Amino acid sequence: MAVERTLSIIKPDAVAKNVIGKIYTRFEDAGLKIIASKMVQLSQADAEGFYAVHKERPFFNDLVKFMISGPVVVQVLEGENAVLKHRELMGATDPKKAEPGTIRADFADSIDANAVHGSDSLENAAVEIAYFFAQSNIYSR
């Protein structure tokens, strides 16, 4: 099995609920190491740049507005099959469809305020990680 890295964002709704530690515990209990982390308040330009791939989608403006509504916690996770493992921990995008015990089932309110973001592929993970972190600020352990 390959050791991978993936980007994870704890979104404004989950930060406001003060469940950062509970989400971190789930990452670590699943064998994912947090190798970089920071809390940031995204600007409109930051959010638009990060989600540029969705620019033509009908939900783009609402997504950007939501992501700048409060601070987020951005982290790099590392571990065996990190991309898939993180996506399984998150659960379905719509929390109503998420399996019980997943982050979104337990902490998300709606398809928009869905607690977490996670890279959907290794290729996107590399791009997303570089968007938020210089290589010199990532510490494998």
From Swiss-Prot:
Active site: 117 (pros-phosphohistidine intermediate)
GO biological process per UniProt: CTP biosynthetic process; GTP biosynthetic process; UTP biosynthetic process
Superkingdom of origin organism: Bacteria
UniProt main location, coarse: cytoplasm
Reactions the enzyme catalyzes: a 2'-deoxyribonucleoside 5'-diphosphate + ATP = a 2'-deoxyribonucleoside 5'-triphosphate + ADP; a ribonucleoside 5'-diphosphate + ATP = a ribonucleoside 5'-triphosphate + ADP
Cofactor annotation: Mg(2+)
Keywords per UniProt: ATP-binding, Cytoplasm, Kinase, Magnesium, Metal-binding, Nucleotide metabolism, Nucleotide-binding, Phosphoprotein, Transferase
GO molecular function, one term: ATP binding
Biological function: Major role in the synthesis of nucleoside triphosphates other than ATP. The ATP gamma phosphate is transferred to the NDP beta phosphate via a ping-pong mechanism, using a phosphorylated active-site intermediate.
Family recorded in the similarity comment: Belongs to the NDK family.
Name of this protein: Nucleoside diphosphate kinase
Gene name as annotated: ndk
